[in-house]
Amino acid sequence: MTIAVGRAPQERGWFDVLDDWLKRDRFVFVGWSGILLFPCAFMALGGWLTGTTFVTSWYTHGLASSYLEGCNFLTVAVSSPADSLGHSLLFLWGPEANWNFARWCQLGGLWSFVALHGAFGLIGFMLRQFEIARLVGIRPYNAIAFSGPIAVFVSVFLMYPLGQSSWFFAPSFGVAGIFRFILFLQGFHNWTLNPFHMMGVAGILGGALLCAIHGATVENTLFEDSDQANTFRAFEPTQAEETYSMVTANRFWSQIFGIAFSNKRWLHFFMLFVPVTGLWMSSVGIVGLALNLRAYDFVSQEIRAAEDPEFETFYTKNILLNEGMRAWMAPQDQIHEQFVFPEEVLPRGNAL
């Protein structure tokens, strides 16, 4: 008699089969995150290309915004919906369009389509980094770093207009359209003087500076460990030894600044922390703008400038510029409101 010891083979369900197929080793990894990433990215990109090629913004912004109307790559856009539509999600099957594709495009339905699919596509890409990091056995800091751009996208394109009266006040998906949105933020919110904007600029420019310094320092301290024509050919991905000298780099920057990183782990964590924190802080600031929160208002300088024609600061001059932007931008940007400002209310600086 033969006795077999062990577990009886269990029946594999559809979930196990699907899990194996999704995680199969292939040129482009799919994974569970790909179920969200690939369709959403395809839809967002396809919607943007369709909108910038064929769809006008005449009915929502009174503008031409497509290649078909004569715009170029810098001036095309998928424009935000009309102000009158509020925060409607503008589904194709909704009451606004009622399955009429042409009407849906005219109302700005492609903007909400691109915005929502784009947001979920970015989230899918972050989940992809989590998933692959788990599969190969590394920590998920890449995904954590990518949360910065996601926070900026969600705060600017979704949270800000949700705090305003409609999707109309979100940026359009186009180069010139986003430039107009930046000017709008400055004129109506004095965004450049906002401390969260300052932290964002410090994070992004600081991250760029750290990246440049780090790359240059590594290139400066590469080991001359080969007779190849250049140092790049001497590198082997599987080599056991270091490819540059941390000790030499530390000595160099100690002489430059009197202080330097002596720990590679702290150094690279700092390079991660600076730009990601900057992105998150700017996102927090945008949410504040959505709620129309004010930042720095130096009222004493404004009062003195109003009373004394000879007193003016860069701050008061910028406030006047913001007033000018609001006065001249509102009639152009919100044609449907039919704003008319008499000449006497338009701002004039003390120097004019």
UniProtKB/Swiss-Prot annotation:
It catalyses: 2 a plastoquinone + 4 hnu + 2 H2O = 2 a plastoquinol + O2. PROSITE patterns: REACTION_CENTER. The D1/D2 heterodimer binds P680, chlorophylls that are the primary electron donor of PSII, and subsequent electron acceptors. It shares a non-heme iron and each subunit binds pheophytin, quinone, additional chlorophylls, carotenoids and lipids. There is also a Cl(-1) ion associated with D1 and D2, which is required for oxygen evolution. The PSII complex binds additional chlorophylls, carotenoids and specific lipids. It is a multi-pass membrane protein. Chlorophyll a PD2 binds at H197. NCBIfam families: psbD (TIGR01152). PSII is composed of 1 copy each of membrane proteins PsbA, PsbB, PsbC, PsbD, PsbE, PsbF, PsbH, PsbI, PsbJ, PsbK, PsbL, PsbM, PsbT, PsbX, PsbY, PsbZ, Psb30/Ycf12, peripheral proteins PsbO, CyanoQ (PsbQ), PsbU, PsbV and a large number of cofactors. It forms dimeric complexes. This is Photosystem II D2 protein. The lineage of its organism: Bacteria, Bacillati, Cyanobacteriota, Cyanophyceae, Oscillatoriophycideae.
